[in-house]
């Protein structure tokens, strides 16, 4: 069977459902596909299809995630739904499923619960830019006042985590009734998707951001100079442009005198390309894996940062024993291991803990032995002798 061509006639946006267990995230996901399928904008997926999510491995961590796609009148969406709470935590920290925005599902029968809060906090820390609220199970609440109270509570909660709680749309839905085909609840799913279209901003394309390429390998070509290879993470680089080499050693400038891909010469390389860049006046020993080539002034190297970290369980290939403050692992950042130290940590809710056990989630302060190009929202792995023992995201740059 020939593969279907991916139509690029609508902007593509990645979203997901987040919220407390049993508040109806998966049912709502199924409802969206059911309602949109009637307009020919989705394939019907039922609860079991989505709930039986296959296991995926990202950075050595096993995560269950379901991927659903559908479109509205103006956009094409890829939607992720995770069956278990632990899967969400891992997913958001490793960035396995990038989210440009999320639908926060909260049951009107319960109101915001522990994981509702945790998912909002996670969304804030890993940089999910916008949320829309689906107040689910509204068919089960007869009293309009109760629904209004729950809505107020959610808005206050969102504001307390620096989301614009007063402005975020809250749509009253019933995933179950929409699947059963009740017209008024189907209309509510349409209303929800209109809110998603209008309130989750179209992501800035990687190509439009300032140029960055992490160096994976370095060669010297006799008579031509030094070539750095890697995958361009974002932006565009043109032949003749000045760039900076950042990280590990002092930042220095150079000019790109050639861009090659698959042994062919190009005028420019763009986000997603695996290229070799010929650098003027640079010796092979001046640069190494782990440095980044960037648009001048767009990024600075740092040594101290705060991060949100998930520490792998023993069964996931992690440590068998706890670690304490002062622990010195390697931090795998973009393309290389950099030795560093975890100088301090707290539990994910900010409470003090003496030690970190396999399977814990922590906030940590890390200090690297040499400065590298780290940015807020960037993912990293924590490794020990080449095996991953944790995954994290940079929540704040300190210095």
Curated annotation (Swiss-Prot):
Its main location: cytoplasm. SUPFAM superfamilies: EF-Tu/eEF-1alpha/eIF2-gamma C-terminal domain, P-loop containing nucleoside triphosphate hydrolases, Translation proteins. PROSITE patterns: G_TR_1, G_TR_2. Residues 60-64 are annotated as: G2. GTP binds at residues 19-26, 81-85, 136-139. Residues 174-176 are annotated as: G5. Residues 81-84 are annotated as: G3. GO terms for cellular component: cytosol. Mg(2+) binds at residue 26. The keyword GTP-binding applies. InterPro entries: EF-Tu_GTP-bd, EF-Tu_GTPase, EFTu-like_2, EFTU_2, G_TR_CS, P-loop_NTPase, Small_GTP-bd, T_Tr_GTP-bd_dom. Keywords: Cytoplasm, Elongation factor, GTP-binding, Hydrolase, Magnesium, Metal-binding, Nucleotide-binding, Protein biosynthesis. GTP hydrolase that promotes the GTP-dependent binding of aminoacyl-tRNA to the A-site of ribosomes during protein biosynthesis. Monomer. This is Elongation factor Tu. It comes from Synechococcus sp. (strain WH7803).
């Amino acid at each position: 069977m020939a593969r279907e061509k991916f139509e690029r006639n609508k902007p593509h946006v990645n979203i997901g459902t987040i919220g407390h267990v049993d508040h109806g995230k998966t049912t709502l996901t199924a409802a969206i596909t059911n309602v949109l399928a009637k307009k020919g904008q989705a394939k019907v997926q039922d609860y079991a299809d989505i709930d039986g999510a296959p296991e995926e491995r990202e950075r050595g961590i096993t995560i269950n995630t379901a991927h659903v796609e559908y479109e509205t009148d103006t956009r094409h969406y890829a939607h992720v739904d995770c069956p278990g709470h632990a899967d969400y935590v891992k997913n958001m920290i490793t960035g396995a499923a990038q989210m440009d925005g999320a639908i926060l599902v909260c049951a009107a029968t319960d109101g915001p619960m522990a994981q509702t809060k945790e998912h909002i906090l996670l969304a804030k820390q890993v940089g999910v830019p916008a949320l829309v609220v689906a107040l689910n199970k509204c068919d089960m609440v007869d009293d309009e006042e109760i629904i209004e109270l729950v809505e107020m509570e959610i808005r206050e909660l969102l504001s307390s985590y620096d989301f614009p709680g007063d402005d975020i749309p809250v749509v009253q839905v019933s995933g179950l009734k929409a699947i059963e085909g009740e017209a008024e609840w189907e209309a509510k799913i349409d209303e929800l998707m209109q809110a998603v279209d209008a309130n989750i901003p179209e992501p800035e394309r990687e190509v439009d951001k300032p140029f960055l390429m992490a160096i994976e390998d370095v060669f010297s070509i006799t008579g031509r100079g030094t070539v750095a290879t890697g995958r361009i993470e974002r932006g565009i680089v043109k032949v003749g442009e000045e760039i900076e080499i950042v990280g590990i050693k002092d930042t220095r400038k150079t000019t790109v005198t050639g861009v090659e891909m698959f042994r062919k010469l190009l005028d420019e390389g763009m986000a997603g390309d695996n290229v070799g860049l010929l650098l003027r006046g640079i010796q092979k020993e001046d640069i190494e894996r782990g440095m980044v080539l960037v648009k001048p002034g767009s990024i600075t190297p740092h040594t101290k940062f705060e991060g949100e970290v998930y520490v792998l369980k023993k069964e996931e290939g992690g440590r068998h024993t706890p670690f304490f403050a002062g622990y010195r692992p390697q931090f795998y950042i973009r393309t290389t291991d950099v030795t560093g130290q975890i100088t301090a940590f707290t539990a994910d809710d900010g409470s003090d803990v003496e030690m970190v056990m396999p399977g814990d989630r922590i906030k940590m302060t890390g200090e690297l032995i040499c400065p590298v190009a780290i940015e807020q929202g960037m993912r990293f792995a924590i490794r020990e002798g080449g095996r991953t023992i944790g995954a994290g995201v940079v929540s704040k740059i300190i210095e």
